[in-house]
Every structure is written in C-alpha cells, then in structure tokens.
Amino acid sequence: MKVSIYAPSYKRPEKSITQIHYPCVKVVVCESQADEYIKNGNDVVVCPDSAQGNISRIRNWILDNLYNDSDCLMIIDDDCSYIGYYNNQKQYKFENDQLLEFCSSSALLCDELGYKHFGFNCVADKGAYREYTPFGFT
C-alpha cells in the first residue's frame, strides 16, 4: 500500500522539524512562503495562497488535491520530534522506514475492517495509552 505523509505548515520554517526525523514527510506550504521553507532545507509541496487561512482549509486542500497520489494519505504536525509507540511499558521511536510500514499496515487493517480513516493518539504521556487494547471503534 502506497502511503503519502504530509505536514501542513504556515510561517514557521525554522520550527518545521518533522522532515529532519522523517524525510518521507512532505511539508505543504503556500506559494508566498515556499522560498523560505526551501532555504530552510524543507522538501515542500506548494499550494496556492488562496488555500491558506486556517488549518482546516489547508487540510481540505491536501485531501482534495493530493489524495490521488497514494492509497493512504496521512496528515501530521510539522514540528514532530518523533513518532513512536509503547510495548511492554517501554517507548520506541519509529525510524523513517518503520513509520511508512506502520502507516501502511494500519491503513490496510482499517481497509479490511471497512473503515476509511483512522488516527493515532498524539499524547506522549504513557498513562494515556492502553497498549494491550490498541483499537477503538468509537
């Protein structure tokens, strides 16, 4: 399953660090800011300035314009220092290839269960996780 991961960003190229840790992520920025992000070393996808306004508008632009490029489209924050999971009370951080594999297998599982979208817990606190009951269908 082909997975594409995008991180919308706005007026903060220096804080857009997700690509440092996960080069597979494409940062989505508006035309007027693209040069700043490119100078910062980001690999960008440029959207029109008219798509910008708030995070919901840019996420909708990503869904409307970039979804056909892959089987699974993920949208994450532009300032992630790591993405990981817990197993046996220990935290593990994904490497780039592991993140792609995890997203691909998660998307495949959801598809097989008849679901079309899913999300991950974004809280770093171990107490917020139920590692032995990893799925919720609410």
Where in the sequence are the language-model features?
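Active-site-proximal specificity loops/subdomain of glycosyltransferases
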Residues: 31-72, 76, 81-95
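Short, well-formed alpha-helical segments that are part of the catalytic scaffolds
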Residues: 4-25, 32-38
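Hydrophobic beta-strand segments of well-ordered beta-sheets in folded domains
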Residues: 2-6, 23-28, 42-45, 73, ...
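Conserved catalytic core of nucleotide-sugar-dependent glycosyltransferases
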Residues: 83-138
